[in-house]
Curated annotation (Swiss-Prot):
Species the sequence originates in: Saccharomyces cerevisiae (strain ATCC 204508 / S288c)
Residue ranges that the UniProt entry lists as topological domain Cytoplasmic: 27-43, 100-141, 190-205, 268-418
Family annotation (PANTHER family): ORGANIC SOLUTE TRANSPORTER-RELATED
Region (ATG8-interacting region): 379-402
Protein name: Vacuole membrane protein HFL1
Known function: Vacuole membrane protein that recruits ATG8 to facilitate the degradation of vacuolar integral membrane proteins during early-stationary vacuole turnover (EVT) when cells enter stationary phase.
Transmembrane segments: 6-26, 44-64, 79-99, 142-162, 169-189, 206-226, 247-267
Taxonomic superkingdom: Eukaryota
A cellular component term, taken from the record's GO annotations: endoplasmic reticulum
Any one GO molecular-function label of the UniProt entry: transmembrane transporter activity
């Protein structure tokens, strides 16, 4: 049944926009799954692309059945919104070669980065990502929003069901602190490694993630302000009408967001034309890979439970020559020396000195567990030696370097003959 709070000429464009945005996003996701040649990169891209369909469905539900959507659909959207911030951070980390490469190689060439906000800069020391503890601080700052969001959604439902406006105010204050801290930590990471990120043209990807979150957040505040001032909504339905109009506006915006996401995270760079000799996963295994949670569980455990036991100087130990050829007087280098790092062979090698009979800087065996990909761990079926990957030999050979050279040679000879 149509929602009576929206006129038909507003209601149906919102519904159709949600459907169109969902179709665009699922088309892009499907093409990724059919060309699944870089699992570690594409699983993150698909998880980010999935944000638009989730927003589209939840916003459409919000204008069709606002009461039910607030309780059953919105918490899913809220949690996934936070999850995408973490996924985007992981995506940037992957582009730069992983956490170890960032800490032990890339960040050694940078001076510590001052906080962009002067007041914070006077209180907190500059961020040096070559220090594992600083990297952990930034990563936890991003992840805490993901951990906080389920509690926030649960608390919001309790406040709505039991009519607790005062508790809801405090909950919103903590929510704003959490989301601000998360975005600020992501901005710090961005600022520290911007020269290394520039070749990957990250601005479009950054806008995809940030615009949809900012649009949802600030439009909600503006519309709520219009409701409070009496500019929007009448009678006892003020709060519901504000909720419906907010979701209706987001429905319209989902179409350009879907197009923007498809451009920022394209599937065509993973085709046989772009990677001629690269094998791809079958569709069903690609689907299983991006829906799997093994990488998330491992990363959450190492960050939340292991913490400094994993992110310490010994586990993230740069090469001796790299450490000496860069900023020798950096805080991270001096801290490594304090924790037992020593150089030998005129700085060509290094070793660690263990103080006392127990080396308390190493990771316990119960925590240091290697993560195994579910797909990589599958055994090979005798009837299919390429399981679970497929080689597109015909397509790959057609776009190989040798065929391209031959094609250019034929074209040049043809032009000379003419």
């Amino acid at each position: 049944m149509e929602n009576k709070l929206l006129c038909w000429w507003l209601y149906w464009p919102c519904v159709y926009s949600s459907i169109i945005a969902t179709i665009i996003s699922f088309y892009t996701i499907t093409r990724h799954l059919l060309n699944y040649r870089k699992p570690y990169e594409q699983r993150l891209s698909i998880r980010i692309l999935l944000l638009v369909p989730i927003f589209s469905v939840s916003c459409a539900s919000g204008i069709i059945k606002p009461e039910a959507a607030q309780f059953y659909v919105d918490p899913i959207r809220e949690f996934y919104e936070a999850f995408v911030i973490y996924t985007f951070f992981t995506f940037l980390t992957l582009l730069l070669g992983g956490e170890r490469n960032i800490i032990t190689v890339l960040s050694l060439n940078h001076a510590p980065t001052r906080h962009p906000i002067p007041l914070i800069g006077k209180i907190c020391k500059p961020i040096d990502l070559s220090d594992p503890f600083d990297f952990l601080f930034v990563k936890k700052g991003i992840l805490q929003y993901v951990w906080f969001k389920p509690f926030y959604c649960f608390g919001t439902l309790i406040c709505s069901a039991w009519k607790l406006p005062k508790f809801e105010i405090f909950l919103n204050v903590f929510y704003n602190i959490s989301v601000t801290w998360s975005l600020y930590s992501l901005a710090l990471f961005w600022k520290c490694l911007y020269p290394e990120l520039t070749p990957y043209k990250p601005w479009l990807k950054f806008l995809c993630v940030k615009l949809i979150i900012f649009a949802s957040y600030w439009q909600s505040i503006i519309i709520q302000g219009l409701v409070v001032t009496g500019k929007l909504g009448t009678g006892n339905q003020d709060r519901t009408s504000g909720y419906v109009y907010k979701n209706g506006l987001l429905c319209i915006e989902m179409v350009p967001f879907a197009i923007l996401h498809a451009v920022a995270f394209p599937w065509n760079k993973y085709t046989a034309f772009s990677i001629p000799y690269g094998a791809r996963m079958k569709f069903i295994y690609a689907l299983k890979d991006f829906l799997g949670c093994g990488d998330l569980i491992w990363d959450f455990k190492q960050t939340l439970f292991a913490g400094p036991l994993y992110y310490n100087y010994r586990n993230f130990d740069p090469e001796a020559m790299d450490l000496l050829s860069t900023r020798q007087q950096s805080g991270a280098t001096m801290e490594r020396l304090k924790h037992g790092l020593r150089f030998t062979d005129n700085g060509r090698n290094s070793y660690w000195v263990a103080y006392g009979s127990i080396d308390n800087n190493l990771v316990p065996e119960s925590i240091e567990e290697s993560w195994e990909d579910d797909i990589a761990g599958q055994r090979t079926f005798p009837e299919d030696p390429n399981y679970p990957v497929v080689h597109d030999y015909t397509m790959g050979h057609r776009y190989s370097r040798s065929m391209n050279d031959l094609r250019r040679d034929v074209q040049s000879r043809s032009s000379m003959a003419c």
